[in-house]
Amino acid sequence: MASELAMNNSDLPTSPLAMEYVNDFDLMKFEVKKEPVETDRIISQCGRLIAGGSLSSTPMSTPCSSVPPSPSFSAPSPASGSEQKAHLEDYYWMTGYPQQLNPEALGFSPEDAVEALISNSHQLQGGFDGYARGAQQLAAAAGAGAGASLGGSGEEMGPAAAVVSAVIAAAAAQSGGAPHYHHHHHHATGHHHHPTAGAPGAAGSASASASGAGGAGGGGPASAGGGGGGGGGGTAGAGGALHPHHAAGGLHFDDRFSDEQLVTMSVRELNRQLRGVSKEEVIRLKQKRRTLKNRGYAQSCRFKRVQQRHVLESEKNQLLQQVDHLKQEISRLVRERDAYKEKYEKLVSSGFRENCSSSDNPSSPEFFM
């Protein structure tokens, strides 16, 4: 270290006042980079955080704007030590601003995260233990409803991001960080869209509220995944409870058309009226229309048969009357015939006697007849 300080004597100030100020400090304790290297590292770190979209949009003090300049009295330390301290400084700034950073945007290795956890205070370690127990209880309570969502988010998050989220959770618990209102707003919106959810929806909402509370305390992606899983359960329950409303809407739509309208309406007009209706409702209405048409056809056939029977019966009555009239005519003609026959017989018998009496007189006219 002495040789490095000797090599950098040209960088030290020459004024007596500055030398007295420098002598008040133990220069052997300073193992930091030079100002240009530190500035480049801070700028690159800020660019990576801004590109990841993890900084807050509110006008607050950020790590990049409030970083104090590093003194340039000593030479840069070896590469391994500088990288390790750079990671530790990143964790220092990250724990100072838990509500502005996104742990998934930081590309740290698990070893660096473990070292950062070890270097933190015992209070932060206790916060991490509480967060781990809360995460285990949340995972056990979520069960089958949010298990898939938690598993998927855990796989996407990775071990490094999980440890980073634990550090942020402990810092947020220590400093009383702001809760994540995004999850609660999401669940409230879900309840607004599905106000008629039954028991499954209520269970999903309860799990979603528990997951949202875990997200407010932890602030990590695992809590966010649990909240998403609970919200999905509530949505599924609400969707299952909406089927009676669809059925009620179908009954109301059935009242829209009377039986006469369904029968008299053409197929094209009916299809135009049924646009936007579910397939089951269309099939049911068309089946009802077919049943009504068949019933009407059967009734018309029955009416025609009855009408034809009445016509045939009336014609039969007319024919019977005509037969009776003809019978009466026949009986009258028979009586006339009998009368004429008797008269003829009388005339014949009387004429034969006259012929016998006048046969001797050939000059009589009856003789030549």
UniProtKB/Swiss-Prot annotation:
<dbReference type="GO" id="GO:0044877">
    <property type="term" value="F:protein-containing complex binding"/>
</dbReference>
<dbReference type="InterPro" id="IPR024874">
    <property type="entry name" value="Transcription_factor_Maf_fam"/>
</dbReference>
<dbReference type="GO" id="GO:0006357">
    <property type="term" value="P:regulation of transcription by RNA polymerase II"/>
</dbReference>
<feature type="cross-link" description="Glycyl lysine isopeptide (Lys-Gly) (interchain with G-Cter in SUMO2)">
    <location>
        <position position="29"/>
    </location>
</feature>
<feature type="compositionally biased region" description="Basic residues">
    <location>
        <begin position="180"/>
        <end position="195"/>
    </location>
</feature>
<keyword id="KW-0832">Ubl conjugation</keyword>
<dbReference type="GO" id="GO:0042802">
    <property type="term" value="F:identical protein binding"/>
</dbReference>
<protein>
    <recommendedName>
        <fullName>Transcription factor Maf</fullName>
    </recommendedName>
</protein>
<dbReference type="GO" id="GO:0002088">
    <property type="term" value="P:lens development in camera-type eye"/>
</dbReference>
<keyword id="KW-0238">DNA-binding</keyword>
<feature type="region of interest" description="Leucine-zipper">
    <location>
        <begin position="312"/>
        <end position="333"/>
    </location>
</feature>
<dbReference type="Pfam" id="PF03131">
    <property type="entry name" value="bZIP_Maf"/>
</dbReference>
<dbReference type="GO" id="GO:0032330">
    <property type="term" value="P:regulation of chondrocyte differentiation"/>
</dbReference>
<feature type="region of interest" description="Disordered">
    <location>
        <begin position="175"/>
        <end position="243"/>
    </location>
</feature>
<dbReference type="InterPro" id="IPR004827">
    <property type="entry name" value="bZIP"/>
</dbReference>
<keyword id="KW-0678">Repressor</keyword>
<dbReference type="InterPro" id="IPR046347">
    <property type="entry name" value="bZIP_sf"/>
</dbReference>
<dbReference type="GO" id="GO:0010628">
    <property type="term" value="P:positive regulation of gene expression"/>
</dbReference>
<feature type="compositionally biased region" description="Gly residues">
    <location>
        <begin position="212"/>
        <end position="240"/>
    </location>
</feature>
<dbReference type="Pfam" id="PF08383">
    <property type="entry name" value="Maf_N"/>
</dbReference>
<keyword id="KW-0804">Transcription</keyword>
<comment type="similarity">
    <text>Belongs to the bZIP family. Maf subfamily.</text>
</comment>
<dbReference type="GO" id="GO:0005737">
    <property type="term" value="C:cytoplasm"/>
</dbReference>
<dbReference type="GO" id="GO:0000122">
    <property type="term" value="P:negative regulation of transcription by RNA polymerase II"/>
</dbReference>
<feature type="cross-link" description="Glycyl lysine isopeptide (Lys-Gly) (interchain with G-Cter in SUMO2)">
    <location>
        <position position="33"/>
    </location>
</feature>
<dbReference type="InterPro" id="IPR013592">
    <property type="entry name" value="Maf_TF_N"/>
</dbReference>
<dbReference type="GO" id="GO:0003700">
    <property type="term" value="F:DNA-binding transcription factor activity"/>
</dbReference>
<feature type="compositionally biased region" description="Low complexity">
    <location>
        <begin position="196"/>
        <end position="211"/>
    </location>
</feature>
<feature type="region of interest" description="Disordered">
    <location>
        <begin position="57"/>
        <end position="82"/>
    </location>
</feature>
<keyword id="KW-0010">Activator</keyword>
<dbReference type="GO" id="GO:0001228">
    <property type="term" value="F:DNA-binding transcription activator activity, RNA polymerase II-specific"/>
</dbReference>
<dbReference type="InterPro" id="IPR008917">
    <property type="entry name" value="TF_DNA-bd_sf"/>
</dbReference>
<keyword id="KW-0656">Proto-oncogene</keyword>
<comment type="subunit">
    <text>Homodimer or heterodimer with other bHLH-Zip transcription factors. Binds DNA as a homodimer or as a heterodimer. Heterotetramer of two MAF and two USF2. Interacts with PAX6; the interaction is direct. Interacts with MYB; interaction takes place weakly in normal T-cells and increases in T-cells following stimulation through the TCR engagement. Interacts with MYB; the ternary complex formed with MYB and the CD13 promoter is regulated in response to differentiating signals. Interacts with USF2; the interaction inhibits its DNA-binding activity on the L7 promoter.</text>
</comment>
<dbReference type="GO" id="GO:0048468">
    <property type="term" value="P:cell development"/>
</dbReference>
<keyword id="KW-0043">Tumor suppressor</keyword>
<feature type="cross-link" description="Glycyl lysine isopeptide (Lys-Gly) (interchain with G-Cter in SUMO2)">
    <location>
        <position position="327"/>
    </location>
</feature>
<feature type="compositionally biased region" description="Low complexity">
    <location>
        <begin position="72"/>
        <end position="82"/>
    </location>
</feature>
<dbReference type="GO" id="GO:0070306">
    <property type="term" value="P:lens fiber cell differentiation"/>
</dbReference>
<dbReference type="GO" id="GO:0045944">
    <property type="term" value="P:positive regulation of transcription by RNA polymerase II"/>
</dbReference>
<dbReference type="GO" id="GO:1990837">
    <property type="term" value="F:sequence-specific double-stranded DNA binding"/>
</dbReference>
<dbReference type="GO" id="GO:0006355">
    <property type="term" value="P:regulation of DNA-templated transcription"/>
</dbReference>
